[in-house]
Amino acid sequence: MYNAGNYDVIVIGAGHAGCEAALAAAKLGCRTLMLTISLESIAMMPCNPSIGGPAKGHLVREIDALGGIMGLNIDRSRIQIRRLNSGKGPAVRALRAQADKKLYQREMTLTLERQEHLDVKQAEVIRILTESGRVKGVLTRTGAYFACRAIVLTTGTYLRGRIIIGEVAYAGGPNGQFPAIELAASLKELGLRMGRFKTGTPPRVSGRSINWDKMTEQPGDPGPLRFSFWEEGPERPNVSCWLTHTNTTTHNIIKDNLHRAPLFSGLIEGKGPRYCPSIEDKVVRFADKPGHQIFLEPEGMGTEEWYVQGLSTSLPEDVQLAVLHSVPGLEQAEMMRPGYAIEYDYIDPTQLKASLECKHIAGLFTAGQINGTSGYEEAAAQGLVAGINAARLVREQEPLILRRDQAYIGVLIDDLVTRGVTEPYRLLTSRAEHRLLLREDNADLRLGRIGYEIGLLDEQRFRKLEAKEKAINDGLVYLGKQHVGGNNPKIQEIIVACGEPPLKGTTSLKDLMRRPRIKYQDLAAAGLVPELPPEIAAEIEMMVKYEGYIAKEKIQVERLAKLEARVLPADLNYSEIRGLSRESIDHLERVKPRSLGQALRIPGVTPADISVLLVYLEQKKREGAKACAG
């Protein structure tokens, strides 16, 4: 072993969590080191070549608002972008972009290599070194010792990674990478509770062998859509995806080979993701369905490789090929890579604080799939928070903890540290109680100021945010002050043209816009309101139309805030509190909630338990007051 250097923060892993963590820590002025098994695997997309979607797109926008990199990077490397759920309510509308995988990696690698205060090195970490319950450094396979004050673990699916294809299983990481065997053992030695999950990926096929005429084209949306609030980004191509379906023949091939499927033969032990099941799992679970959607997605502009979305599998290679050839358009498909399942270790996230720091190992933060989540976006969001808080720990500042009513990032982390995981966790809009407040469109308004205050968002971007806030507020004030009457034929013409009943009497433009079919652009076209940039006009319109619903959600948030404000001591011995059941005590001791609000969200803890805790806190408060008076 030799002393290889001294850093403030060391980030282990260079996936989507690691990239955000390393950049955040370095931007906040910490001397930061990123260590990865392979420099070629930085920001790798081993599964789907896309970023975004419902809840996931919200996360990307929030990362961007706080000063993270994912939104900017996908804008620079996307080859298609679409707005999903555009016909639904604003809470669930979301962007989704297809990425040029290699370009995404190149752009991210360059960003990391050029970042001040950040060193990027290729090395396999085999041990986390601690002293007196605090991290002190890491040891690599080649004997290098790097000292540090904080570590961010972002190991993805590498911990004791095991690749499974049919009857074949071997140690490995994603896309032919090496697994991290000794590091997993080191974490167990540190006393971390660990579990085993699995995920999978579909085969890739050559575009030259696909019969596109048998598929339905899925083009991207026109217009200036982007994830980042701060940069418009370069002009990017718009490459179509393609839709086809499995059929009875496909399903029969799978059913005839279930005895060879590791998912059913017992070869796979880890629990897989509920919301991204393999094709063999879908065929068994949804036996009555005649077919399942299959999307062909481009992997990039510089390759003929296509991703077969919806056909994730760990069936033997020969069965995978037969399955592919049964799908319309893929009869002659050349399989470039087989699908596979990968098993990996994760840690129980209830061992973490809301800052993503381990409760019993000071300075050790974890982010991404090691915490039991799935998805690039979930990983990146955790990485950003872990990187920020590692830097804040080094600088002796309070951690950044986002509330559930502030951000989807807050929902994600609170779910992990409070409820834990029994399967790979995927963020959904339905997991957020206040999703109308947490829209994709207002992420900058919600979080941009926080990003600026902690030091990630620069002055130029903050000034842009302030200008946007002012334009929105001015627009709302103008709409409230300006009144129109039903005796104005021009007004009536606009109203009728929009399909709304004629106006009777006088009303404000704000009340007029509350009508479902009347849009800001209709009033602007008639010269009744000033022309505004589309994103500002859309924000004003949304705030007007949903004002009542938003007000109700804010009242609910205020009610819950009272429970969040009642802090529970970290050293509270729940077994000493009379009235709590044994089950509740076990749950409370495992999670050690920071507040009554968090305690209420722990599975197995009832409202009656909260009442007991409330009485206990009041009793302790009175005893404390008496002691002071005496």
Curated annotation (Swiss-Prot):
GO CC annotations? cytosol
Q: Give UniProt keywords alphabetically.
A: Cytoplasm, FAD, Flavoprotein, NAD, tRNA processing
Q: Which domain of life is it from?
A: Bacteria
Where is this chain's protein located in or outside the cell?
Cytoplasm
Specify whether Endoplasmic reticulum is a keyword of the entry: no
Query: Does the keyword field hold tRNA processing?
Result: yes
Q: Which SUPFAM superfamilies match?
A: FAD/NAD(P)-binding domain (SSF51905)
One GO term under biological process is: tRNA wobble uridine modification
Q: Which GO terms describe its molecular function?
A: flavin adenine dinucleotide binding
Task: Write out the similarity annotation.
Answer: Belongs to the MnmG family.
- Which NCBIfam families did the record assign? mnmG_gidA
PANTHER family given in the database record: GLUCOSE INHIBITED DIVISION PROTEIN A, PROTEIN MTO1 HOMOLOG, MITOCHONDRIAL
User: What does the protein in this record do?
Assistant: NAD-binding protein involved in the addition of a carboxymethylaminomethyl (cmnm) group at the wobble position (U34) of certain tRNAs, forming tRNA-cmnm(5)s(2)U34.
Q: What is this protein called?
A: tRNA uridine 5-carboxymethylaminomethyl modification enzyme MnmG
The protein's organism comes out as: Moorella thermoacetica (strain ATCC 39073 / JCM 9320)
Gene that this polypeptide is encoded by: mnmG
